[in-house]
Amino acid sequence: MIQVAMEPKAFPEYLEAAAEAGAQVVPMNSKVKALIWLDYSQPQALAELLDQNPQIEWVQLPFAGVDAFADIIKRPMLFTSAKGSYREPVAEHALALSLALMRVIPERVVTKTWGRQFADSLYDSRVLIFGGGGITEELLKLLAPFRTKVTVIRKNPAPMQGAWQTLGFEQLDTELPNADLVILAAALTSETRYLFDAGKFALMKPTAYLVNIARGPMVNTSDLIGALNQEVIAGAAVDVTDPEPLPDGHPLWNAKNIIITPHTADTRKQVVRLFSDRIRENLKAYGQGKPLVGVVDPELGY
């Protein structure tokens, strides 16, 4: 039977998933070679644990983005993330935010008068998705009924099913002026950090909308506030912010035509169920000597 440690704290749902995979969860000891790490905010604690246990050969991380653990994943061992696990709820949230923006829901919610009669439609629109992972794969399925023409910008411009065209990062500036809706769904790396700034917003149509369900620091927050208040773009919806959590009174809360959700594209209820599936899948594969799902590439950073 496989022995695996869960640190820093094991949760009942994950213990059950491990048992269903035929694994035994044990306290960390010198014989344990597999670790399921369940803390989202303490990379130093994981680093110290790995220093103390050089026998560990595989670490399962609980999140899709591993930017906070960029130094740790360079260690000579196998790391797997939860990338792809949360694709359905996150893509669903991105679609909901997109429709809310285009149908001017923020304005409708707060108004106390009949107001202007205006809305955009997602049907037959041009959509640019920045990033080409599991969330994008799911988004392409959700967008298909709207007859959208979707351009995917990704590091590896291999074609994606459902996309009108798939292009490399170097084509971003060329394609931004064509998009009615821009959705950020890429990993946060040194290449994508603060990539969306005043220069990128200036390339977008003044009627275009931005949706960020990736990472907050992919967007320069001050530049986004300026772009919204000066009507450089028509609106934005963000499930992630920089800083995060966004402090009360921060200027972004009062920017024009902004929707902010508190990183709830995947809630704890959803995460527990979906990450339990990943635990089961990878523990079974590990025990059988088969390839694991969600392997992290230390060079790419995701």
Please give the residue ranges for each predicted region.
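Rossmann-like dinucleotide-binding domain for NAD(H)/NADP(H)
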Residues: I213-Y302
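N-terminal glycine-/charge-rich "phosphate-binding" loop or analogous flexible N-terminal tail
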Residues: M1-L38, G287
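Phosphate/diphosphate ligand-binding glycine-rich loop within oxidoreductases
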Residues: A34-V110
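Short, conserved loop/helix-junction motifs that constitute active-site signature segments
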Residues: A47-Q55, D71-R75, F201-P206, A227-V232, ...
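NAD(P)-binding Rossmann-fold cofactor-contacting core
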Residues: P145-G162
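Oxidoreductase and adenylate-handling cofactor-binding alpha/beta cores
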Residues: A91-E107, P145-F146, D277-K290
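Rossmann-like adenosine-cofactor binding region
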Residues: P157-P251
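Glycine-rich NAD(P)-binding loop of Rossmann-like domains
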Residues: E107-E138, Q165
